[in-house]
């Protein structure tokens, strides 16, 4: 039996990050956590693409996939529940959009888009009290790049 495990050390990987600027107080922290994690593994080929909001993340991710320059793409954002159905529509469509791209792609795409009930939860998940989801999602991306390289 063979077992394959993703490693964090993926030499010379080129990473694309797509981040929504809406809820920028939170998303700046997510980007910082992600880029600091990638820097720990000496990954310097990191490009960050800012989009207005979470809804635009799947489109920009699709554009980056078409460029065929990256070994993996990390998506970051923060959707915070309000008083209307807008939250549910955005969350469902963005998650579906990113998942559909991931399934059709030959490179991994990780989902670091927070969906929270309030700003306090979002700040906690961006590293205020616990781990930074940007960093955690970056680690997941490195593992998936490693696994992808092992099977291809």
From Swiss-Prot:
This is 6,7-dimethyl-8-ribityllumazine synthase. 5-amino-6-(D-ribitylamino)uracil binds at residues 22, 54-56, 78-80, 111. (2S)-2-hydroxy-3-oxobutyl phosphate binds at residues 83-84, 125. The active site is at residue 86. One of its GO terms (molecular function) is 6,7-dimethyl-8-ribityllumazine synthase activity. Keywords: Riboflavin biosynthesis, Transferase. NCBIfam families: lumazine-synth. It is an enzyme of class 2 (transferase). Its EC number is 2.5.1.78. InterPro entries: LS, LS/RS, LS/RS_sf. Pathway: Cofactor biosynthesis; riboflavin biosynthesis; riboflavin from 2-hydroxy-3-oxobutyl phosphate and 5-amino-6-(D-ribitylamino)uracil: step 1/2. It catalyses: (2S)-2-hydroxy-3-oxobutyl phosphate + 5-amino-6-(D-ribitylamino)uracil = 6,7-dimethyl-8-(1-D-ribityl)lumazine + phosphate + 2 H2O + H(+). GO terms for biological process: riboflavin biosynthetic process. Catalyzes the formation of 6,7-dimethyl-8-ribityllumazine by condensation of 5-amino-6-(D-ribitylamino)uracil with 3,4-dihydroxy-2-butanone 4-phosphate. This is the penultimate step in the biosynthesis of riboflavin. PANTHER family: 6,7-DIMETHYL-8-RIBITYLLUMAZINE SYNTHASE, 6,7-DIMETHYL-8-RIBITYLLUMAZINE SYNTHASE DMRL SYNTHASE LUMAZINE SYNTHASE. One of its GO terms (cellular component) is cytosol. It comes from Limosilactobacillus reuteri (strain DSM 20016) (Lactobacillus reuteri). Belongs to the DMRL synthase family.
